[in-house]
């Protein structure tokens, strides 16, 4: 199932009291839809899901669905390392009108491949919503094998994967061994163009908050056979992509949005704001990028 080319893993705006800032969220959604986002992934890693309560997640999903009003797909992060909790949240989320759910591989428990298969299988069987798997071993401590993904892809409503392993060989084999209607998205911004070259469907991106239109142009150039032009854009946007992960995400991207007059507030603990030196580095990268667009 194809949700679009550039899906933005959306940040969650907070006010000065660290409550969800729905006015800022309204502005952010407009900004993203108007600047290259084909879809929104809500309450994922970038949305600070570990520090959101159950009630906050539901309110977030309800608001985004109502605001978007069908303009782009909305995918809700309902994954957990507790299978029963993920099932319960997924069932409740289905009532909000989201277009799909994203399920992260169980973290901390370090399950086996067979355990992960059973975990995803029972959650998928509990809902009619399309399911996107999320493999992010750098955060979860477990890496989904190709064979596990292929087995799961045979379940009717498991339709996609966001793979943030950074392993293009693995991604290639997933693409090769799954049906054409099973979509594969890179979860690594810097691998957007290489992933397209091996047959991926697109990117679930953090950097698209800042450079969504540039990423769309890069993808369009590639699809039109203008590979050199796409590579030039890739080289130009790469420093921005790298800077978005130079410090724990979503600290850099939230800071960048605030700098660009898209207010999203600060992060919740245990994350903290950038140091003065880190902020200067971010500002320098953004300034250099803007200058490069004028050359």
Curated annotation (Swiss-Prot):
User: Which Gene Ontology cellular-component terms appear in the entry?
Assistant: cytosol
User: Which keywords describe this protein according to UniProt?
Assistant: Amino-acid biosynthesis, Cytoplasm, Diaminopimelate biosynthesis, Lyase, Lysine biosynthesis, Schiff base
Alphabetized SMART domains for the sequence: DHDPS
Q: What main location does UniProt list?
A: cytoplasm
What are the positions of the active site?
A: 134 (proton donor/acceptor), 162 (schiff-base intermediate with substrate)
Q: Name one GO molecular function term.
A: 4-hydroxy-tetrahydrodipicolinate synthase activity
Cytoplasm as UniProt keyword = yes
Which reactions appear under catalytic activity for this entry? L-aspartate 4-semialdehyde + pyruvate = (2S,4S)-4-hydroxy-2,3,4,5-tetrahydrodipicolinate + H2O + H(+)
What EC number(s) does its UniProt record assign? 4.3.3.7
A biological process from GO: diaminopimelate biosynthetic process
Q: Which SUPFAM superfamilies match?
A: Aldolase (SSF51569)
The listed locations are: Cytoplasm
Q: Give residues annotated as binding pyruvate.
A: 46, 204
Marked site: Part of a proton relay during catalysis: 45, 108
Pathway where this protein functions: Amino-acid biosynthesis; L-lysine biosynthesis via DAP pathway; (S)-tetrahydrodipicolinate from L-aspartate: step 3/4
Question: Assembly state and interactors?
Answer: Homotetramer; dimer of dimers.
Q: Function of this protein?
A: Catalyzes the condensation of (S)-aspartate-beta-semialdehyde [(S)-ASA] and pyruvate to 4-hydroxy-tetrahydrodipicolinate (HTPA).
Family, as annotated: Belongs to the DapA family.
What this protein is called in its record is 4-hydroxy-tetrahydrodipicolinate synthase
Q: Which gene encodes it?
A: dapA
């Amino acid at each position: 199932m194809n949700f679009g080319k550039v899906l933005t893993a959306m940040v969650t705006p907070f006010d000065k009291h660290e409550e969800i800032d729905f006015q800022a969220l309204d502005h952010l959604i407009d900004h993203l839809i108007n600047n290259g986002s084909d879809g929104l992934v809500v309450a994922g890693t970038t949305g600070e899901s570990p520090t959101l309560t159950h009630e906050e997640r539901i309110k977030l999903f309800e608001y985004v669905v109502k605001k978007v009003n069908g303009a782009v797909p909305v995918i809700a992060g309902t994954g957990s390392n507790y299978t029963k909790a993920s099932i319960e949240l997924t069932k409740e989320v289905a009532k909000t009108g989201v277009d799909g759910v994203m399920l992260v591989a169980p973290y901390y428990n370090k399950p086996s491949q067979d355990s992960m298969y059973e975990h995803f299988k029972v959650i998928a069987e509990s809902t009619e919503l399309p399911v996107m798997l999320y493999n992010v071993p750098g955060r979860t401590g477990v890496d989904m094998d190709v064979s596990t993904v292929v087995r799961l892809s045979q379940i009717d409503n498991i339709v996609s994967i966001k793979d943030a392993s950074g392993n293009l060989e693995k991604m290639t084999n997933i693409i090769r061994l799954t049906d054409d209607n099973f979509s594969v998205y890179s979860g690594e911004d810097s691998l957007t163009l290489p992933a397209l070259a091996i047959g991926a469907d697109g990117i679930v991106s953090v950097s698209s908050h800042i450079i969504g239109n540039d990423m769309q142009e890069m993808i369009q150039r590639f699809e039109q056979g203008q590979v050199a032009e796409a590579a030039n854009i890739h080289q130009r946007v790469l420093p921005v992509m790298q800077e978005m992960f130079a410090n724990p995400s979503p600290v850099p991207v939230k800071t960048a949005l605030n700098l660009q007059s898209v207010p999203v507030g600060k992060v919740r603990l245990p994350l903290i704001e950038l140091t003065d030196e880190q902020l200067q580095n971010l500002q320098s990268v953004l300034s250099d990028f803007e200058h490069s667009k004028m050359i």
